[in-house]
Amino acid sequence: GYWWSRYWQYSDNELRDLIGQMRSLDIPIDVLIVDMDWHETWSLRRTNAQKDEYGQRIGWTGYTWKEQLFPAPASFFEWCRTENLKTALNLHPASGIQPFEEPYQRFVEAYGWTEKGKSVPFRIDEQKWADAYFDTVLGPFEKIGVDFWWLDWQQWKQSKYTKNLSNTF
């Protein structure tokens, strides 16, 4: 069936309405991909948005629910399951794990990061980093219903740490 993805600042209720409209038109939708506004984007939409130490606008990478759009994420994903939808969230992980993100503390403890309060670079090429990332950052989202991830990589083409390694594999 149909996959839906659009870069738009949808709320959970707007997505429910959208799926209802598709169903009323007999559009056989199977997959709902929620673009980046599921997470906090802070000043991302400003013309002169501040950049982080990785050269990305603050809010480009994110792992903290934007509660004004998704006040009850688990409830939303439960609804998606009742609608037989597979769901994905958009990721732009170039800025690693920032200290202001909800999963930061879990991640740094699992990874063994010793520079507390400092961002942890994106190091998917490192097994220990990848394990901590999947267990403590992505895992909690999957437990509430995220089926898969849309890695929307738009930064540098190769790893800054492993020669010739594509960031999208």
Where are the predicted features?
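An acidic-aromatic substrate-binding cleft motif
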Residues: G1-D12, I29
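Aromatic- and carboxylate-enriched substrate-binding clefts and catalytic-loop regions
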Residues: P28-F169
